[in-house]
Amino acid sequence: MAANGIMEVTDSNFDQDVLKSDTPVLLDFWATWCGPCRALAPIVDELAKDFQGKLKIGKMDVDRNGATPMRYKVTGIPTLLVFKGGQVVEQLVGYKPKEAIAEALKKHVG
């Protein structure tokens, strides 16, 4: 886990860290070459602080992990998926402002 509390999620740890999580998980699908992904990164970092203890936040590099994005039909990045109880409960595709993401997350956390 990174210093900012954000998990690095891979195809191999996805089931354990995301699907079996007791708390909701926001998973950010990104790539190093993706400009909008880089623009979204500081927002995801801020959300990790704002929602600390209420949900987990993870990032998955789509260039290093192909199975999970294919499984969830992630065709454009950045894509944010919110998982709760092992199911996708929210999907946000493309760059979104912090307020829009926070509103979506509030629907799924205690």
Annotated model-derived regions:
Residues 59:
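Conserved residues in the N-terminal Rossmann fold of short-chain dehydrogenase/reductase
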Residues 1-26, 31-56, 64-110:
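Proteins that catalyze or organize thiol-disulfide redox chemistry
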